[in-house]
UniProtKB/Swiss-Prot annotation:
Induction: Strongly up-regulated under conditions of MRP2 deficiency. Residues 54-73, 121-132, 193-302, 371-426, 472-533, 598-963, 1043-1085, 1129-1199, 1244-1527 are cytoplasmic. Its main location: membrane. Pfam families: ABC_membrane, ABC_tran, TMD0_ABC. Keywords: ATP-binding, Cell membrane, Glycoprotein, Lipid transport, Membrane, Nucleotide-binding, Phosphoprotein, Repeat, Translocase, Transmembrane, Transmembrane helix, Transport. PROSITE patterns: ABC_TM1F (PS50929), ABC_TRANSPORTER_1 (PS00211), ABC_TRANSPORTER_2 (PS50893). This is ATP-binding cassette sub-family C member 3. Residues 910-932 are annotated as: Disordered. It comes from Homo sapiens (Human).
Amino acid sequence: MDALCGSGELGSKFWDSNLSVHTENPDLTPCFQNSLLAWVPCIYLWVALPCYLLYLRHHCRGYIILSHLSKLKMVLGVLLWCVSWADLFYSFHGLVHGRAPAPVFFVTPLVVGVTMLLATLLIQYERLQGVQSSGVLIIFWFLCVVCAIVPFRSKILLAKAEGEISDPFRFTTFYIHFALVLSALILACFREKPPFFSAKNVDPNPYPETSAGFLSRLFFWWFTKMAIYGYRHPLEEKDLWSLKEEDRSQMVVQQLLEAWRKQEKQTARHKASAAPGKNASGEDEVLLGARPRPRKPSFLKALLATFGSSFLISACFKLIQDLLSFINPQLLSILIRFISNPMAPSWWGFLVAGLMFLCSMMQSLILQHYYHYIFVTGVKFRTGIMGVIYRKALVITNSVKRASTVGEIVNLMSVDAQRFMDLAPFLNLLWSAPLQIILAIYFLWQNLGPSVLAGVAFMVLLIPLNGAVAVKMRAFQVKQMKLKDSRIKLMSEILNGIKVLKLYAWEPSFLKQVEGIRQGELQLLRTAAYLHTTTTFTWMCSPFLVTLITLWVYVYVDPNNVLDAEKAFVSVSLFNILRLPLNMLPQLISNLTQASVSLKRIQQFLSQEELDPQSVERKTISPGYAITIHSGTFTWAQDLPPTLHSLDIQVPKGALVAVVGPVGCGKSSLVSALLGEMEKLEGKVHMKGSVAYVPQQAWIQNCTLQENVLFGKALNPKRYQQTLEACALLADLEMLPGGDQTEIGEKGINLSGGQRQRVSLARAVYSDADIFLLDDPLSAVDSHVAKHIFDHVIGPEGVLAGKTRVLVTHGISFLPQTDFIIVLADGQVSEMGPYPALLQRNGSFANFLCNYAPDEDQGHLEDSWTALEGAEDKEALLIEDTLSNHTDLTDNDPVTYVVQKQFMRQLSALSSDGEGQGRPVPRRHLGPSEKVQVTEAKADGALTQEEKAAIGTVELSVFWDYAKAVGLCTTLAICLLYVGQSAAAIGANVWLSAWTNDAMADSRQNNTSLRLGVYAALGILQGFLVMLAAMAMAAGGIQAARVLHQALLHNKIRSPQSFFDTTPSGRILNCFSKDIYVVDEVLAPVILMLLNSFFNAISTLVVIMASTPLFTVVILPLAVLYTLVQRFYAATSRQLKRLESVSRSPIYSHFSETVTGASVIRAYNRSRDFEIISDTKVDANQRSCYPYIISNRWLSIGVEFVGNCVVLFAALFAVIGRSSLNPGLVGLSVSYSLQVTFALNWMIRMMSDLESNIVAVERVKEYSKTETEAPWVVEGSRPPEGWPPRGEVEFRNYSVRYRPGLDLVLRDLSLHVHGGEKVGIVGRTGAGKSSMTLCLFRILEAAKGEIRIDGLNVADIGLHDLRSQLTIIPQDPILFSGTLRMNLDPFGSYSEEDIWWALELSHLHTFVSSQPAGLDFQCSEGGENLSVGQRQLVCLARALLRKSRILVLDEATAAIDLETDNLIQATIRTQFDTCTVLTIAHRLNTIMDYTRVLVLDKGVVAEFDSPANLIAARGIFYGMARDAGLA
């Protein structure tokens, strides 16, 4: 380098330490300034260029139009190039004229000139690639300015010293160069306009990071606008940014799915290659037999393949940050030596202070960008896992559903996916922690020599303990997750059947079950927490113990080893660095343990079998046929016997085919087979054209009526009007508060069963499909509506005429109008053909018609089929009881098919006017000008209130509530213990400072024992106090979890039915799962970390102020800055967290809704649409999640700047006051300041996390304080023993509405039912029949009037005293998972003989006795492994056991075939002959022998007399009887 400078004007030396270091006025040599210093920016740009060009090539955002800013940048670049070339030509000019400049004057202008030309070209290339702000060029211009500052100062000082400018030309060109690069730097900080095709031009609220400048991205300033806005106004969903394209669910899930499919293909190839050949020799067979089991697809590998690159980038940031963290201890060492050396130049100390600040700022920036990458990757983890699970849940087979309930799958989507998100920030610790430990040990070795090996040995001894804790924690985690799954599953069942629990007064039994599971869950949590606290002592003490052991060995191993300030506090700083990886290792192990459990669960679910999309072939089939089945054999699961055998069916195109047969013969299974829902064992199935499907029990979405009908299709007003008219929905629209924009509510809760079925049918009609599969759609409506629907929709004259229709039905009167009939028996086709042909055969079908057709028609059946052509439906609607829902379950399938009815509440709750239409359904034709109005929903059209995020700060009462739940004494004790541990920590370090000063006084060795002993005692005391605080917090946290869950559970179990009608079950379950999870496992650790960081920060500031009192001057401005950042951050992050919490519930509600309707979704080929809807809901959640992550980074930059200023001022004041400070105090002060950044940052983070997570307590308390129903027992007003003795029921001027503000559904009802009377209750749909029974049980409370039973006002007694004395057999039979005995007798009140007697009378004895488990036969969730008919018989057995004086039948036999119905009616007449029986009936023939019949019309008594008198009066009842063929 000296040769480049020559020996002339620049001198001959490249470096001169006397000029640059050992002086009070340092400078660099002219040679250094004109060579290396000028080349540094150029070297940087040329080194960065290849990678940057590669990046630009693969990240083109579209070109930016040439702007004035871009032109100005270009001009500056050209001018800089010209200045460099002017310097070069000036050197050549000197050479020509014999002055021979130094070689550097040729090389440097050439290098700088070419580099400036490169920078100019790069500006243009960046513009063409859409770069708005170039980080590479900003750094380049910044380096140019920084490197020019030294010669800028030197030239001025030289000119001042010499009194003249020695080289005017180069002096001038240099300052022109400086002005130009400074201008270029300033211009580079301004952003260009967005690219021509940028999303910002069309997106109203684009993600600001994409268009932010480099400095804004570097310091996260682009978030400041939201922080200020969030401080001034509570953030709402509309204020949130759109997501970047790469962060959207669709892209993330697709990438993960592709990686998972690749894993599955690799596994399939591996299995294929591992399969032994057919002709293997004996030796080969031995070898093959020893092969390992075939491997399974690895979800972990799929995750790494998808997100590995993000982890690699974050790992680079982490590596740089880890290396930088070891620079400050070395700078501290230099600073202490500087303090110890009074002869050292002052600028050394200021330089060290500046370098410590600069190093700390670089650490902060790099660490925050690392966290940004890693947390974003964590969110992508969660997004991808949720999306993959959602897609898998849409295609799992029925055999898988018995193993995976909706509750378990929701846990996979919520808890397990969240655990992967929580794990992401810790993953890099797998390599980072060992690296930091190794580097710390290396530098400690440099400082203390071999003595450090003693500390290392101690750390190695901790590893087995760590492993043992990990094993135990994993075992606890597995057990706890199983219990949590059981609790969530049971809670979903309780929500599903809450109405039944209330009707039977069974809440205490299920309350006891939930509390039993919860007790086991809390016991495991308590054990795990105590195990964790015992290790807390070890981990808290381990860095200190390592320090102590190392120092002890150091001072005792060699008498010449003296512990001075440099060795002690540099070692303490290194041990503080060591503390972080050691302290994070337990959290890493805990998170890895939890994630490994979750990984296994997710992988197991994703590896389950899927439905075969090729089981139903869509290719062209036999000409003229729409459906063909050839030799078809089907089963619901591979391990079960076939349900359908050897089917050979051909359905002509455009035909109307009826499928009939007895209960359990496989009618609904046939529909399922056609949909591809069953597993095909043999044969072929062909279907040509699109399919529409109407399940036996309607599946309704939680959206408007119109959206349910359109089902994703575009609105065609004419077809929409025709559909509503044909499905008899027009009159309903007039009654619904919001017309067709009325929100139907979750599971259609504000519609009657008939209305839900007609909406489901309307969905199929509007779809305009080619093939319609109708699974008994007429069973849920009365005979008049059924006839209307058949005539105008299904029949030969209906809107579906000409379409292929497969109708499962028991409506005898409709059969003559079908093209042909398929008769099933025992899963096989027993007869098939047109109606007349089947009659002529005189087979089982003809015999059945003769037995069960109405009397007046029997004589005509054998004459000709035309005699029945115009017959009315006689209300003999045999409801196929095989599938309780769309197609997922078969009649005789014993498998626990639990998914289908999870989260379902089969409610009879109706809209404000009851169940639907209140008058006959005439054929209503629309005039040309009459249209169904498609308008915005009326204000009262919404049923479910949208969940709103709370605004403002969390009320102090919420913190107080949690403190009371923990225990006030416990809370106080925890705080005092932390005060004690902080005092012990300060004492230990002050004692160490005094110990190091002994070296200056040359104290004797015998003083060392005292110093070491006190230091050890204080350190161990600190760890012991922290352990006690952790144990107290663990005990208090578990206590709080118990109290809060108990309050929530008890309130919800006592909530009125109206609460469940208007609150989505997903929202309630989210509270029981996610919010309780936060209370159980998140809050206590967050509080501990907050206390730890708070007392650490206070301790640091106290120590620094005590060491350097001058520091108090800057405390106030730094505190103001800190408070400002905290205030802006807290307001914004709190609201973002609330928005995230609120937007999470719809994800789970939609998921449960999707799984419930999976068969319908697949039938309509809308799986992809629902995946998009799910992705949209997840994206809505992410829109608050990403800003929340950025808010933490924005906070950290601000807070760590404050912390780094503390480091700067601590070092500066130590330099300024070095004459009055000893090295021990300086070491103590600065080493403490190096910790304050982390403590201050962590304190705000934990404060925010606490406020964010305490929202869970807020929600739990909110749901724990909702209005409850009346007391179960009123001690002062209990009915007498044996009440009611007679069973008299009297309504006195009784009126009722479903909720405040709605219209009355019963108006001034007055009637008297005598004891022992049999009263039938009839009326058109929506008349208020079911409402009347709900009032009797006080599910609905009176708006006016009263109900008296045996003279006692039911409003005066407790609900359980009332409900336990009444019995209902509901319309929708609900069973719970558990034994049959539990479903009949949850309290264990009856003997086994009584239960068998009830089963005998309810015609279930044969079935139950044939089961190996007998009464312990396990019912699946919802009783789905029993047919609907069998479940209804179980409800009859319940009624027989209760033996109450009043029995209510709510269309109880609607799901039973006629033969079973006759048996049940006979049982009721004999066993309840002395009881008062109230029957809501669709089949009028079942009540014709009743004492009286009550006819309701629009909530009032229209007729009330004996059936004979009512028929004679020729009123409403007469009309209904005539329609049914009974009059």
